[in-house]
A protein has these predicted regions:
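A short beta-to-alpha transition loop/helix N-cap that caps and shapes the active-site region
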Residues: 46, 111-112, 145
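C-terminal basic regulatory modules in eukaryotic proteins
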Residues: 69, 101-102
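A charged, well-structured terminal subsegment
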Residues: 126-170
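Short, glycine-/small-residue-rich phosphate/pyrophosphate-handling segment
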Residues: 102-140
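Residue-level signal for beta-strand positions within conserved beta-sheet cores that form or flank
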Residues: 31-33, 98, 133
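N-terminal beta1-alpha1-beta2 submodule of the flavodoxin-like/Rossmannoid cofactor-binding fold
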Residues: 1-92, 152, 156-169
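A short small-residue
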Residues: 1-6, 101, 138-146
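Short, conserved loop/helix-junction motifs that constitute active-site signature segments
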Residues: 94-98, 128
Length: 170
């Protein structure tokens, strides 16, 4: 059994980035993958910001470091991922993600910040030794249907990422 850890960097529940994570996790074979979802908005701000490392934060860091596949997900604020995600990854030791694959997921209101995933989140996780999937996911408002379901382009991006995961771990 392989471990996949999704890290939600949005300060709000039911965000678009969380919806994408749920679609990915629901598509992974549960007989092959044990999934953990870490919602950073639920971890104490003192632990995250003051690095006091309470038990909940320690457990989240350890689960992430031990994961085979990591899915950090964040909305785009000021052309980059959230501070929640930043302070979480800042607490990891150098090279702590060596050998782990990462599928970055980022959402925004428009395609204008689509390169922010490549200029922000990707270098951050690579600095910790992670191997980044080629099929990262950046989705914006127009890629969702009016009923809130994922549109065809978003489904296609998710499917491309799932196929890459299957090739890596198949």
């Amino acid at each position: 059994m392989r471990n996949v850890v999704a890290i939600l960097g949005s300060p709000f529940s039911q965000s678009s980035s969380e919806k994408i994570v749920r679609l990915i996790l629901d598509s992974l074979n549960s007989n092959e993958w044990a999934a953990t979802v870490i919602d950073l908005s639920k971890i104490s701000a003192d632990d995250l910001l003051l690095r006091s490392k309470g038990p909940e934060l320690d457990q989240a860091l350890n689960k992430t470091i031990e994961a085979d596949l990591i899915i950090p997900a964040s909305p785009t604020y000021r052309a980059t991922y959230t501070g929640l995600l930043k302070v979480f990854f800042d607490q990891m030791p150098p090279e702590s993600l060596s050998g782990s694959y990462v599928l970055p997921v980022q959402t925004g209101g428009s395609p204008h910040h689509s390169l922010s995933i490549e200029h922000g989140m990707v270098p951050m996780v690579r600095s910790l030794g992670a191997l980044v999937l080629a099929n990262t996911i950046y989705a914006w408002s127009e890629q969702w249907n009016k009923d809130g379901s994922a549109g065809a382009d978003l489904i296609s991006m998710i499917q491309d990422s799932l196929e890459e995961i299957s090739r890596l771990y198949g």
